[in-house]
Amino acid sequence: MVTGIVFHEEYLKHEQSPTHPERRERLAYTMDQLREEGIFESERIVLLEPFKASLEDVLEVHTEEYVRFLEMESKKGGIIDFDTNIPVGVFDRALLAAGGAIRAAQAVLNKECENAFAMIRPPGHHAKPYIGAGFCYLNNMAIMVKWLLKQGFERIAILDWDAHHGDGTQEIFYNDDRVLFISTHQMPLYPGTGYPEECGTGKGEGYTVNIPLPPGTGDEGYMMVIDEIIEPVVNEFKPQFIAISAGQDNHFTDPITSLALTARGYAEMMRRAVAMAEKHCDGRLVAVLEGGYSVEGALPYTNLGIIAAMAGFDLSAIREPENYLPELLWRKRDSALVKLKHNIEDVKRVHSKYWKCFK
């Protein structure tokens, strides 16, 4: 199995401030770790060069007014909200990030690789058609999925496992029955959306599946969600392409969330996603980097685990350094599983009228 990795040094130049959670070290430390592990020397890994997304592709998702605003503000610097500034030059870097997602999908379709990981920034899943938010400017995932729809795909499944609900992606596909949007996210947490009752409108009713996770949810809880919700729905939907919004802020060392996933947990989630892609879509799968702010304690190891699972490497050695593990004992809560079981039943109740697997 060959896995493509999209990366460009330009992604390291985006910076709101040196102390902002979404800073260059998120990717810089990861790339150092991947090089140290010899990932790029493997015949199973191919490095892919991104290109800038075209305005035509961006306008499939975002309004012309917002795109014009972002382009103009990017020339002098500006602000969207209290945690999302517009640094000088961000428009071109956001285009390169969105184009990186498209490049990953293109490589899979062209059979340059079986699957691909777009290691891009700035992230995108909070960006809505008319405005950016939550460190995001352009919705990379939505732009890629719209591009795939134009290639003729009729059923695409998005799995967003970022700790924060992908409200932008949800809004963009909320009334579209061609796109199954599944989100697992901590609740309560920014942006305050993603309740089970948010399940789509019009033709898209039933095609948005939100699974709130209690603080303290760890590997066992995530596997329970895959077993009881995600796999049954995906099996019934039968996607032709699977896209992963691969946020990594659900790690137990992340400074702005309260979940307890481990690097091995990420690897196992991706292994399960790859298996679903092999079952339904000839292996076609693209992961797109979203959040994740533990630049030393998590990202180098979680990204390694994700790539190892995508490329079919042995996962037995995927783990964090032992000095980080005491924080896992502090973060993980057994009570979270009890609450999660109730949440899972709520999701099944809401979606029982849409999916046979829950009847």
From Swiss-Prot:
Sites where the protein binds Zn(2+)? 162, 164, 249
The opening ranks of the lineage are: Archaea, Methanobacteriati, Methanobacteriota, Archaeoglobi, Archaeoglobales
Q: Which Pfam families match?
A: Hist_deacetyl
- What does the UniProt function comment say about this protein? Probable deacetylase.
Q: State the needed cofactors, names only.
A: Zn(2+)
- A GO biological process this protein is involved in? epigenetic regulation of gene expression
Family statement = Belongs to the histone deacetylase family.
Q: Where is the active site?
A: 126 (proton donor/acceptor)
Manner of cofactor binding, per the entry note = Binds 1 zinc ion per subunit.
Establish whether keyword Hydrolase is in the entry: yes
The EC category is: hydrolase
The protein's UniProt keywords, in alphabetical order, are: Hydrolase, Metal-binding, Zinc
Single Gene Ontology MF annotation: hydrolase activity
Name under which the protein is recorded: Probable deacetylase AF_0130
Task: List its EC numbers.
Answer: 3.5.1.-
InterPro entries, alphabetized: HDAC_PDAC (IPR050284), His_deacetylse (IPR000286), His_deacetylse_1 (IPR003084), His_deacetylse_dom (IPR023801), His_deacetylse_dom_sf (IPR037138), Ureohydrolase_dom_sf (IPR023696)
The UniProt site entry described as Polarizes the scissile carbonyl of the substrate is assigned to: 293
